Curated annotation (Swiss-Prot):
Residues 1-29 form the signal peptide. Belongs to the peptidase A22B family. The PAL motif is required for normal active site conformation. It is found in: Endosome membrane. One of its GO terms (molecular function) is aspartic endopeptidase activity, intramembrane cleaving. This is Signal peptide peptidase-like 5. GO terms for biological process: proteolysis.
Amino acid sequence: MSLPPFTCRLLAAAAALYLIGLLCVGADTKDVTAPKIPGCSNEFQMVKVENWVNGENGETFTAMTAQFGTMLPSDKDKAVKLPVALTTPLDSCSNLTSKLSWSIALSVRGECAFTVKAQVAQAGGAAALVLINDKEELDEMVCGEKDTSLNVSIPILMITTSSGDALKKSIMQNKKVELLLYAPKSPIVDYAVVFLWLMSVGTVFVASVWSHVTSPKKNDEQYDELSPKKSSNVDATKGGAEEETLDISAMGAVIFVISASTFLVLLFFFMSSWFILILTIFFVIGGMQGMHNINVTLITRRCSKCGQKNLKLPLLGNTSILSLVVLLFCFVVAILWFMNRKTSHAWAGQDIFGICMMINVLQVARLPNIRVATILLCCAFFYDIFWVFISPLIFKQSVMIAVARGSKDTGESIPMLLRIPRLSDPWGGYNMIGFGDILFPGLLICFIFRFDKENNKGVSNGYFPWLMFGYGLGLFLTYLGLYVMNGHGQPALLYLVPCTLGITVILGLVRKELRDLWNYGTQQPSAADVNPSPEA
């Protein structure tokens, strides 16, 4: 016996709701706790290190500058290619015996402070100092409390242990090694964010109008896979409970935010590769379910007879052939993405699955009125702010940012967001938005669309166009805040909630309809509606 379609959709929605409890934000590379003293107040720069071995151009490494020393040029054409020499002693903690005149000094980390190494290399005539870290990460090189004044006039930067070992090996083999150091800047605005904005707004719009656009005719209603079926009672006509929907209650909204916070803390303390793998499997199941429902719905809208042929299978019983074929297709796509999820192009499949899952969730989970919407969105509003800005005071770092970065062992993160490559950024990376930043406002906007439709409101007197504008504006303000704050993590709901819920409340007050929005679906039907009198 197979599970009912709604049960499958409800399970997928539940998995998705746990995923959206984790809202991803950006992070920066500034250390605001490091002491600021004369000569030690630089911002950390990411550096491209191009190398040549015996005249042959090799792999380009990534490095990071120190909080002291001179800044590197951002333009490659202004950088100068210089030879590299190992320091003697290799740790650069005492006077150097090697000749470094107009050369880049290559040293190793340890035994003394970064500032001591920099001063020793500069005294030895080095044009720059490259430190080899003792691990595959780039640590921030800051000044110590005893460094009351520094006068380091050469660039100081750090490379990973694997990059440093490759350079050191070539030098020890008496090969000529040359480096070109420059620090290209990321653009203030990456135009790829426009596509992310369109994907987010488009997802909310499609999810809102989906039931209306794909509403089946009476003779083919049985083949509808995604659009919820209206019940015949009075509450259904008033936006109340429907057969295949899950109405979120006020208590449920509070419990969800508390559960999401608990889950976030568990991820923070127990983040591991197997934990991420389990959540990725949940994501794949939810995305596959959403893709299946969307495709079946679209096909049966165009060809109502396509879903009429059934096939009797063991354990499953009567199954639509169309549904089975689409399910197999979605399963193959899901497996292909899962196997290639760590490749550079995996973002496209992740976005497709994410959008399908969110559209599916917004058809199942619904807000009954503005009262519940206010409770849910206000809780999510403070939840987002707390875990981004206040949690560092308790956990020594932002829990939200730490979870968003994923596992340090594998570098893999939870696929809980839409992302698109930063096309104009020399450092690559991704523009991202968390599922919660789409689904939380999306729940409100979907309710508003139903309210407008059931009350015969148009563009001029409706709420839906205003909320779509508000959501788009909120996203714009989110990215504007991100760029103004130089990439510092921004809780998106800080902007999205006022631009959606705030607009709803203001319009409701102006139009004197706030009471109707607040109590929508809770009014008791009149006796005449329940027991209509017979006609005379």
